[in-house]
Amino acid sequence: MTIPHEGGSTGILVLRDDDHDDVLVLDRLRSDPSIEFVDRFAEQLAGVRRLLPQPDPDLLEEAKRWAYYPWRRMVVAILGLRGFRAVRLDRNRHLITAEEQRALHALRVGVVGLSAGHAIAYTLAAEGACGTLRLADFDKIELSNLNRVPVGVFDIGLNKAMIAARRIAELDPYLAVDLVTSGLSPESVDEFLDGLDVVIEECDSLDIKVILRQAACARGVPVLMATSDRGLVDVERYDVEPGRPIFHGLLGDIDADKLCGLTTKDKVPHVLNILDCQELSARCAASMIEVDQTLWGWPQLAGDIWVGAATVAEAVRRIGLGEPLESGRVRVDVSAALDRLDQPPMPSRGNGWLLESVPPTAPAEPQPTSEIVAQAAIRAPSGGNVQPWHVVAKQHSLTIRLAPEHTSAMDIAFRGSAVAVGAAMFNARVAAAAHRVLGSVEFDESQPDSPLQATMHFGRGDDPSLAALYRPMLLRTTNRHHGMPGHVHPATVELLTNTAAAEGARLQLLLSRNEIDRAATILAAADRIRYLTPRLHEEMMSELRWPGDPSLDAGIDVRSLELDSGELRVLDILRRSDVVARLAQWDCGTALEDNTNERVSASSALAIVYVDGATLTDFARGGSAMQAVWIVAQQHGLAVQPMSPIFLYARGRHDLDQASPHFAAQLHRLQLDFRELVKPGKEGHEVLIFRLFHAPPPSVCSRRRVRHAIPEPHR
């Protein structure tokens, strides 16, 4: 008829329509005109359907229950146990995760003293921080309790533990609540503690305070206590510190028998020993003097009691989840905190700067010609705009050395840096052709100080096709607007394909909406993992430059991300490593995919540049092709944004294990899915992926470091 151990000893019945005995009880209840039935089951079921992620079908199929509250003369329709808890506790997530909630449900908590203890017990029940509550208090509600105990005039004269249990039953009829309405005594304390994991002591009797702690210490049960003045909370971890002195040793070797029957005034010296009179608020300390004079009881405020309840609830959660919590005491002093109010700092990144627009312009040309070529080289793109090169301009040559100190976890085996070196050399060739000094280029992977070195020997070449790209090269930029998909003319497709081939690479364009959307899903999932991998997250955030940052000559200016003010605030949150660590711990963060998914899906085409070969020279050759395609695409009215999934330069599972150990398996699956989509061929290696779309010019352009002359190394 009733669910075992659920509803406790409050007299509540949980009944179901498909149980014969329960149906008989329900029929009797319905026949009683003094009993009201309330059925809002459909509204509760709608709450189940709203759950995210979508609940299992069996949760929706749980049979309706009826909870009978005899003290209210009411029967209320409720969801089944699983559905009820899922909906009621849903707003706890992820402050308390579903897994943590299940762990806490195994916790058995006792509360002694249900004046201040009422708020604590109710808070624990509301948070779902335990599966069983055991409440003990012999006292009855008086009118003077109503300044702090959340009950009403209808409850005056009723047992405090019973009233607390009833409120909790109305909150959660499935929560097991055991009552001890006779209070505690030396004879009953062991029975009360039996099976408890935590006990919270909020009683007035000093002898019971001592006896309870002595028994809890013997059983290894931790004791928590909140004292309302200045938010004092005591933690005594007898479970991890066997034999720890009770009350932290503040009472010495006290005899509990001598504390029995003391008047309120006689308790004051002992209370002051426990609370440390020097730490009491002035109002509380002065009130102690007035006990039995102008006051007959301890003064307490409801707000202070609820502060204590919140603090104790946090302590219970820590114990239940095995999180760090030492013995000791702390004050959560709201009054003192309000004395330390600060003016909030003005936002350093307000909305005004979002409106700034800095269109790209071709810079004035420096002299001599070798420096013109060098300045063109450093305008090349690179991952995170880290500019992983050293450029040495001499009278008869230009050398671009890969700078290994600028590598990152995603720059696997320097392949991304090699692509950047190749792009820089392409720019140099374009500038050299425009100034009629184009010469031969050679790549060298044998130098001890650099994994790759590219050198152009100036000559008298003036390749017209390269020279024609000079101004478009100077105006090339990354465009991160959301953009709009549009038609890419077949002639443009052919031109871009031939442009890549002229540099010894292959270009593939995904043009169908289905292919683009599939790629968007894969690339977005990889970007989520980039956020959730600690090292990758740290490196990604270190690349961002916010207005007011000391140096904007490297990295990515956040204005170039083309985010609105709300998106920028979210990005500001995502800069915090502790935030993304929590998302990773919970295996959440699907919202981190949205930006990439939406932008890639808004593309006119997705371009992939390949090389057939895996040396750094091959990747540099691919970088030249990538840069050529980028310049020509922009020249023909297309906006370009590179996409760099973590797996871009990975050649096997080992590379992915190094880049993101926890998510390597997922990344490997994503890489396989992407290659299944694009089919690069057995020898094909991706150099870069970028989206082509239609959009206005970027708000700002990435800057470059000021180039200083770099001497030749000693040989």
Curated annotation (Swiss-Prot):
It comes from the Bacteria. Pfam families: ThiF. GO terms for biological process: cyclic threonylcarbamoyladenosine biosynthetic process. SUPFAM superfamilies: Activating enzymes of the ubiquitin-like proteins, FMN-dependent nitroreductase-like. InterPro entries: Nitroreductase-like, ThiF/MoeB/HesA, ThiF_NAD_FAD-bd, Ubiquitin-activating_enz. One of its GO terms (molecular function) is tRNA threonylcarbamoyladenosine dehydratase. GO terms for cellular component: plasma membrane. This is Uncharacterized protein Rv1355c. It comes from Mycobacterium tuberculosis (strain ATCC 25618 / H37Rv).
